[in-house]
């Protein structure tokens, strides 16, 4: 049987790397979305209310 280097790591290192990459993408995407919403809100000034 062939043992991987660091075989005591547990799950497949490639699978762990994939999970880390997906989590990083999710966090960056949510931060980017919040930043874009903030910039768009600044760009559009609030219109004064008309009675």
UniProtKB/Swiss-Prot annotation:
It comes from Homo sapiens. One of its GO terms (cellular component) is membrane. The chain crosses the membrane at residues 13-33. Keywords: Membrane, Transmembrane, Transmembrane helix. It is found in: Membrane. This is Small integral membrane protein 38. The lineage of its organism: Eukaryota, Metazoa, Chordata, Craniata, Vertebrata. It is a single-pass membrane protein. Its main location: membrane.
